[in-house]
From Swiss-Prot:
HAMAP family: MutH. This is DNA mismatch repair protein MutH. GO terms for cellular component: cytoplasm. InterPro entries: DNA_mismatch_repair_MutH (IPR004230), DNA_rep_MutH/RE_typeII_Sau3AI (IPR011337), DNA_rep_MutH/T2_RE_sf (IPR037057), Restrct_endonuc-II-like (IPR011335). The gene is mutH. Keywords: Cytoplasm, DNA damage, DNA repair, Endonuclease, Hydrolase, Nuclease. It comes from the Bacteria. Its main location: cytoplasm. Belongs to the MutH family. The lineage of its organism: Bacteria, Pseudomonadati, Pseudomonadota, Gammaproteobacteria, Enterobacterales. It holds the Pfam family MutH. Disulfide bonds: none annotated. It comes from Salmonella paratyphi A (strain AKU_12601). One of its GO terms (molecular function) is endonuclease activity. Gene3D superfamilies: DNA mismatch repair MutH/Restriction endonuclease, type II.
Amino acid sequence: MSALCPLPTPPASEALLLAQARQLSGYTLGELAAMAGITTPKDLKRDKGWIGVLLEIWLGASAGSKPEQDFAALGVELKTIPVDSLGRPLETTFVCVAPLTGNSGVTWETSHVRHKLKRVLWVPVEGNRSIPLAERRVGSPLLWSPSEEEDRQLRLDWEELMDMIVLGQVERITARHGEVLQLRPKAVNARALTEAIGARGEPILTLPRGFYLKKNFTQALLARHFLLQNP
């Protein structure tokens, strides 16, 4: 009988968090769901955040969708990342919703993006769609903070994107803007509009936007830490 069980309360230290995350490595999502007493969906079409929720249960995460980090007492954010058979990310990584108004005086140092990425527990998960969801395995975790160079890359992109938002150019921003950080619409449906600033400084309604890490950024950080081949 396995002694492994979900943490009932948030871990008291990074070491305890990492130890629990390491214990999950090698298990399938179906095994972890069964041990936690929750049902595994057939796919993620209607349950896009299910993997993250499952791992939050196992790791004792506290924040849910609140603005603080998932492990607020530790200042650590949990990010699951679907990878291919070579350990390369299969998609961009959501960071946080972008503020489209009220941005006067905001700096990179005080930004929500930097706050969310200050300390991240990355948990790779098999993401190939040919593998049934229940059979996808959890990989080795990585506790990461941005290096000086990574912080510089993120800051430059964030400043460029925020300048465009403040100057009323939000609707001109595409996913191609930014080297490592991009801004994309994030809405359940096209009717979920939010207020922003237009080209002449007037209030407009537009789709909510989210900040996402591009795959080249997450691939490089995973490759560096797991010594994967980085093409």
